[in-house]
Amino acid sequence: MIKTCIIGASGYTGAELAALVHRHEQFELATLYVSTNSADAGKSLGDIHPQFFNVIDLPLQPIDEDNLSALSDRFDLIFLATPHEASHKWMNELCAEKNGQKAVIMDLSGAFRIKDKNKFAEYYGFEHHADKLLEQAVYGLADWHQEQISSANLVAVPGCYPTASLTALKPLQQNALIDSTHFPIINAVSGVSGAGRKAALNNNFTEVSLQAYGVLGHRHQPEIADYLGTDVIFTPHLGNFKRGILATITIKTAANVTNQQITEAYQQAYQGNPIVRLRNNWPKIDDVVGTPYCDLFWKFDPKTGYLIVTSAIDNLLKGAASQAMQCANLRFGFESHRGLVN
């Protein structure tokens, strides 16, 4: 059994991770950690998230920040569902080898996703100082970076919007079907759970009305652009529903592209992949909530050369926890969908 802990287990993503690890026959959910100042310290996961009552009743233990390196001795796999700054602050200690052993780290924060450390001050609000780890971190886009993930000791699990967007766009980019003089335009709507569990007026369900935010400055824009290989125009929106993301993407295709080429690009990319579902109609958020799937559908206008693609995911699962589990599966030699789909 692969002995596993989760740091930041009280949040929405941490709880989803706990459920996935608990159900996986090859992983042992050994310990759940929260920060030392967390109001949830000492409680059980089932007390905070009642769906896990009498299912996962492990206590939420306050993490000892002065002895982080010892976790590499205790665990084979560490998930971090922590704020970006916490992952950045703790990572050197967590990755330190002790007694010749080093745990595999799956970081669900944004602290190691983008490679240009100078962008962190602009997009994340802190100066990045872990140059070596930033260079070593593998971007965990699980349906595209399988080989790199399989040997990585630090995986930066992608953000929710980048997951939805890159899954839709990479087959086109890989086959040179995008007009390089026109940036893809991504309009995406997320449920309020994407803002986290901490109470705030701007994500209070009764206060939320469909609204754009982070316009021309959201931290996921450089992440999408870096791993697509071209700039994009990305506009996120907050919707008044709990969970899920629907991204609608407008692409100007390269000259003389045909609908058959587009279809073949998607089929070649995702044939035999049970996680990415190529639909025969426009997906709804309800189709993917509570699942690890990414649902795609598209329509091409050959007269204008414009292509519209929709991508639907659960932001807490495919956009976070289940993709982290895909990465863990790959790293430990299992099929990426093991424990996620039948």
Regions found by a protein language model. Give the residues of each.
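Conserved active-site and cofactor/substrate-binding residues in soluble primary-metabolism enzymes
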Residues: 12, 136, 163-167, 215-222, ...
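Contiguous C-terminal substrate-recognition/catalytic subdomains in enzyme active sites
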Residues: 68, 202-289
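C-terminal active-site/capping subdomain that shapes the small-molecule cofactor and substrate pocket
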Residues: 250-342
